[in-house]
Amino acid sequence: MAMKWSLNTYQTAQNWELDELIRQAKAAGFDGIEFLMDFGQKHGVEANADAAWLRTVKEKVDASGLEFASVTSCASFHSLNDAERAEAMDRAAKSIRIARDFGCQHVRVLGDRVPEDGTRETVLENITHCMRELARQAQPDGITVSMEMHGSFTDPNLAVPLAEAVEMPNFGLVFNSQFRENAQTGWRLPPDGSIRPLYDRFRPHLTQIHTHQMERPDQFPMYQELFRLLKADGWNGYVAMEAAYTGPDPEKVLRLYTALFHTLAA
């Protein structure tokens, strides 16, 4: 089975109503849609969305032949405030229930920021506990919960030990295609520019991938190596286009990204 291509409803798609989102995703050749939540996007998929609307979303997406690639919550768990973490847990738990009702097997959440002060270990312990509990909730429905390698967790020296500490078979990491070639602290891309050491760290926990501006000359060689490694491993998960383009011709731009994806994945 080949890798699949999904449209994350980031900036390019954030103002499209559901019907237009589906039309654009189909026209550009995506296999699925990754519904980004918590920003009030026009698709209307939110933790507290009306149940009737969520049923409509499922019916329309199913009828289109597209898949629900991910229910993507922006709930994060770095706060030292118990009430704030509890609120984030509630939103994430609702996202798991939405994924179950959609027939979606993936929910993404965030870590997200780890301080460099005396609270560091407490924050990491809190995040680990929350991730383990969410994975436990999702497990009976066959749903994978993933933390994105975002914020402080672009550093594999933080993300990978946390994934190991969660120690749940349905928990993993979304690689956010941050290759850390210019990192000032923590793990940094080696001088030869190969991403292999980074890939080898996160690969055992990899569930999905987010891509950004793959066409940039300074990024393209790293994406080429990433896809070579994925193909050599036979990885067949979802790769998302987290598109930030907001210009006048999104359909053309998304089609070009689709062509680039298929070229790299071939």
Describe these PLM feature segments:
Residues M3-E17, A75-M89, D117-V123, W187, ...:
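Active-site mouth loops of central-metabolism enzymes
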Residues F30, L66, A99, C104, ...:
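A structural motif
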